[in-house]
Amino acid sequence: MLLTSISHSGMVWNLVTGQQMQLPGRAADLHRMITRDNRVDLRDAVAAFCTVSKICMLDGVGRLNLAAQRQASPLNEAPTSHLQALFMDDSRRSRLQQATKEAFGSYVLIDPTTPGHFKFCLADELPRHPDLERSLTNEALEYFSKAISMEMASDGVKAYSGIIAAVLSADFRVFLIDEPEAFLHPPLARKLGLFLTRIAGERSATVLASTHSSDFLAGCVQSGTSVCVIRLTYERNIATARVLPADRLTELMRDPLLRSAGVLSSLFYRGAVVCESDTDRAFYGEINDRLQRFSKGGADDAIFLNAQNWQTCSNIIKPLREMGIPAAAAVDLDVLLSDDLSKLLKAAFVPPITASGWTQTRARIKAAFQKQLKPGDGSPELSRLVKMVGVQGLTGMDRDSIEQFLNDLSMYGLFLVPVGEVERWLPELQIVGHASRWLIPVFEKMGSDPRDPSYVHPGQEDVWAFMRKIAAWIADPHRKGIPS
């Protein structure tokens, strides 16, 4: 619903419905309206409060009507709808037209040619002179007769135009908007976020929006206006609320790696799996999809992201976990050969004392690999061998130690590939190669039609067990590795 801040004789107009209601003169009167449920609709009471406070509230019910035709009132009185308010103000109407032209290539105009009503219409060109928009001359009648009625427009055009028109119709100081991205395709949602935050910045106003759209949020951040995100979750009877401050959000959006990885989209998922490369991301995503379709244990509502290598995985999982998103890392086993494992432990919020001990364990495991594999030419050769043989490259107590260490790491959402590297999964397919030269043949062998006898269904071991373990950590409300 949307209400004008103009009142007369103690009455206000609901700009969406066009109906009058009594405006409470004091806070106590407003309180009585809210508590007197059997006599006054609660929505009316909230609407009255919004009017007094210059609040623009656009909920799901009222927003659907914003592009509809409205009845006109005497032009020398206060406007009774957002259409009439814009019709009376050339500057606001011009801004509406420019906003819609930039968004979808058409100007939104207010057609006054239907007696007693105002309605929106669309045109490719503006009238020859501004006064034509507010006249009923033959030229005006001909112009509007050629315009396209808003009733013929898509729901996205109606929704976008209605919200912009409502926002511009009065000098609101607070905007309350429920799911502003409804009916909008991604680019339009981004443009709406950009427009709303710019308006808020110009007026020193505040936009409070509940959204499930990373595109809308990206548009808000793009405006340069201070944007703060509060991420709310409710799962297994546990509610959480985490704040992502404006400076941190801006930092995330400016980082090319995080921006290209789609980190902002992760805000709208229950969990994330961060992989070393796009090949890993595509493969593990397919494994998870098949688990969800044909078995149990897949990660529900999880997004799969890729870094550039395992060293940059820490740059992604840390900010996600700070936002309360359980972000698991799936990396190749050769991470154990590098001192940089400490960065991954820090990003996973492993306690410092524990991390210190694990750093020493890593060094011992590396020494064990060097002793048993006997690489010929140093670290590059050792890395190749470790990724080729996995944990099976160690025997006896060394094998027990590395398996226990991998289990310890998994408790903090760090999952190292026990077979060495992603290309070693599903050995029964007998695919040799690396990156895309491996991935494409693997997908072909796995099949795309579940009815085909050769289609690869989930099993109990190998990569299927690995992904189930990742999914279990993401789903566990008592998981380790998420800062309080």
Features from the language model and the residues they span:
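Extended helical coiled-coil dimerization/tether regions that scaffold
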Residues: 41, 45, 54-159, 165-169, ...
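Short, basic, glycine/proline-bearing loop/turn elements
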Residues: 78-83, 141-150, 182, 247-248, ...
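Switch/communication elements of ASCE P-loop NTPase nucleotide-binding domains
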Residues: 1, 128-265, 463-465, 472-484
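Electropositive, glycine-dotted interaction segments
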Residues: 1-81, 297-300
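Short amphipathic alpha-helical segments and helix-helix/interface helices
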Residues: 97, 193-197, 217, 317, ...
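Charged, glycine/proline-rich intrinsically disordered loops and linkers
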Residues: 18, 23-28, 33-35, 129-148, ...
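Acidic, Mg2+-coordinating catalytic modules of nucleic-acid enzymes
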Residues: 13, 75-76, 106-108, 260-274, ...
